[in-house]
Structures are given as C-alpha cells and as structure tokens.
Amino acid sequence: MEFLSSVFQPIVDLMSTLVTYAFQLTQMIGYPSYGVAIILLTIVIKAVLAPLTVKQIKSMKAMQELQPRMKELQDKYKNDPAKLQAEMGALYKEMGVNPLAGCLPLLVQMPFLIAIFYALQGYPYDQNYVQFLWLPSLGEPDPMYILPVLSALSTWIMSKQTSSGATGAAAQQQKIMTIFMPLFIGYISLSFPSGLVIYWVVSNVFQ
C-alpha cells in the first residue's frame, strides 16, 4: 500500500489540492462543507472520465452481443484450441470488436481512482468543518453504519447494470462476484474514513 502511495504521490497531491479548491468554492458560496466539496469533486472527476467510461460500456455491450456466437465456436472447436483461436479472431475482426478495448479505459482511470483513495484517506480536514450531515467527522468511519450500507447497495446496483450476460462457468463466476463485491466493499467501508466512502457512493451513483 505504501508503495502504491509513493508511486502515485504526484497525482495524490493533485487530488488533495483539488479537494481543498472544492472546499474553498463552498466557502465562496457561503456554505463551507467538505462533504459538499467531495461530492462536487466526485461529479467533476466522473464528468472528465465519462468518455472513457462510455467507451468501456460500449465495448462490454459489444462483447455481450457476441456471446451466443462465441459459445457456438467454443462448442464447435472445443477440441481444437488453435482453430478456436483463429475463428474467434476472425469473429472479432468481422464485428469490429477488440476484446481488450474494455480494459484500456479502466487502466487509464486506475491512477486517478488510486490517487483520490489516498488523498481522501489521509486528507487534513479543518476540524471546524469536518462534520457533515449525521457524520461527526469525515475523517472517521461512519458510526451509524449508513455509509457502509449505501456503499454495498450502490456497488451491487452498479454490478448488476454492468453485467455482461455471460453464459456457463463465466455466468456463475459473474454471479458470485455480483454478491461478493458489494459485501466486500460494505465491509471495508466500516473502517474507511467517511469522506472516502462518500466519494465511492457518489461515484457509483453517477456511473
């Protein structure tokens, strides 16, 4: 974890500065709030990364539409891996689909996601404005466990929306992940700073 933090430190510093700027904006409009600042910054980040997100979703949908034909090829050439690979490549070329295209947007987004994670996890809040709604401190976990529940629920909804419609073993694995990931995110949110969990929930809402 410390290694990741050091590698992405320049972007972490940038994100921390953006949180400060967003907070200063809330001061200018007469409602100083780190909670509002985090929400505003999250929306801005999602807007900036929107083209990549759209590209990723389109790629996933294209792969989903190819699932029936891919299944046919897998059944037909299950004993001939070389032929299967050649036919799959021909199918991708025919339909203009790159199976790796959906990964690139995610890889581009990862540094920013990691950076905002570290920026909010250790952000030096002004203690005069660290309270938000029912939360006594954005730098501490939610004592009422509302945010962990919201993080799990929003992650589950996002997982359902982005499911690829896979079949067979892949479908079973996808079903397991759809259950596991929300529970995992909800669990780790129990110990994460509330400000960070707010970012995650809002990010899922605007996915």
List PLM regions with ranges.
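Helix-loop-helix
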Residues: 1-207
